[in-house]
């Protein structure tokens, strides 16, 4: 049976697989495109499964944002060459959009979400593995929602909403939403640059905090200072530590004469609260 070239091309467009695979599938399915699509999806998933033990260490971070909801995802591949491929970029942007639309709060939720014309997101990722020839892996997802305020965000990269590192900011206020968005974006850019470990001092891991204080106290003890002087030195060094790792205590990257908490207070809007943030860095362990 001679295959229609238009059917072969349509099959290639729908599956992303090669012309020879598409022609063979159509021949085996007596020209039935729907059956051929199912067959090629099976082939694609089988090819993807063979690559499952390989390491996906490159990739992209993508953001999808509306006024009161934002999501960041990380999709990994094996090389920068594939990370710059149009099909990979299209896939990662689609996944961010689906995660936002479905309000996914975890990687597993997104993997099980529906992906139009393919099945699930996980099947779309495995299909991408087959088409691009590298292992693809959805590794991280960050979700933020603000009921009384805005979600702002920033991703550092050449394309808007796409790069290697991104941040989401939740601001609570009844003030002007456009001004809140601008404040939030500036804080998100700060977070991307300074990579804080916690929102406030109270949010720091207590064991890590106690360990840091113990180290500083041991260092100061070796100075043989009077107890009152030693306490002031310890408090000063702890304050310096907070400035390094706590977002609200960090000096604002655009004006180091003020902390982030001061920058928020200095806005023309009243009662603005930074309630949460998320930072996603490509390749970083959770």
From Swiss-Prot:
GO MF term (any one): translation elongation factor activity
Record function comment: Associates with the EF-Tu.GDP complex and induces the exchange of GDP to GTP. It remains bound to the aminoacyl-tRNA.EF-Tu.GTP complex up to the GTP hydrolysis stage on the ribosome.
Cellular location(s): Cytoplasm
Pfam families, per the entry: EF_TS
Gene: tsf
Classification via Gene3D superfamilies: 1.10.286.20, DNA helicase RuvA subunit, C-terminal domain, Elongation factor Ts, dimerisation domain
Protein family per UniProt: Belongs to the EF-Ts family.
Any single Gene Ontology cellular-component annotation: cytoplasm
Entry keywords, A to Z: Cytoplasm, Elongation factor, Protein biosynthesis
Region called Involved in Mg(2+) ion dislocation from EF-Tu, residue ranges: 79-82
Protein name listed in UniProt: Elongation factor Ts
Domain of life where this protein originates: Bacteria
């Amino acid at each position: 049976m001679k295959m229609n070239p238009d059917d072969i091309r349509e099959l290639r467009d729908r599956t992303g697989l090669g012309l020879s695979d598409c022609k063979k599938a159509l021949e085996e399915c007596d020209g039935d495109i729907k059956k051929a699509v199912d067959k090629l999806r099976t082939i694609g998933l089988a090819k993807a499964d063979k690559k499952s033990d390989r390491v996906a260490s490159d990739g992209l971070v993508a953001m999808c944002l509306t006024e009161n909801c934002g999501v960041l995802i990380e999709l990994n591949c094996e090389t920068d060459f594939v990370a710059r491929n149009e099909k990979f970029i299209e896939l990662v942007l689609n996944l961010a959009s689906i995660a936002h639309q479905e309000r996914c709060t975890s990687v597993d939720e997104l993997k099980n979400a529906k992906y139009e014309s393919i099945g699930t997101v996980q099947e779309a990722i495995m299909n991408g593995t087959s088409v691009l020839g590298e292992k693809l892996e959805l590794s991280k997802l960050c979700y933020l929602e603000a009921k009384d305020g805005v979600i702002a965000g920033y991703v550092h990269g050449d394309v808007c909403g796409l790069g290697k590192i991104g941040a989401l900011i939740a601001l609570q206020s009844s003030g002007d939403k456009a001004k809140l968005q601008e404040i939030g974006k500036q804080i998100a850019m700060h977070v991307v640059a300074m990579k804080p470990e916690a929102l406030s001092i109270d949010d720091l891991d207590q064991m890590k905090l106690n360990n840091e204080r113990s180290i500083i106290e041991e260092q100061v003890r070796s100075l043989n200072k009077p107890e009152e002087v030693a306490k002031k030195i310890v408090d000063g060094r702890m304050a310096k530590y907070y400035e390094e790792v706590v977002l609200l205590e960090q000096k604002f990257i655009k004006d180091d004469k003020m902390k982030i908490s001061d920058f928020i207070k200095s806005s023309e809007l009243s009662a603005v609260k930074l309630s949460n943030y998320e930072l996603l860095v490509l390749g970083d362990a959770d």
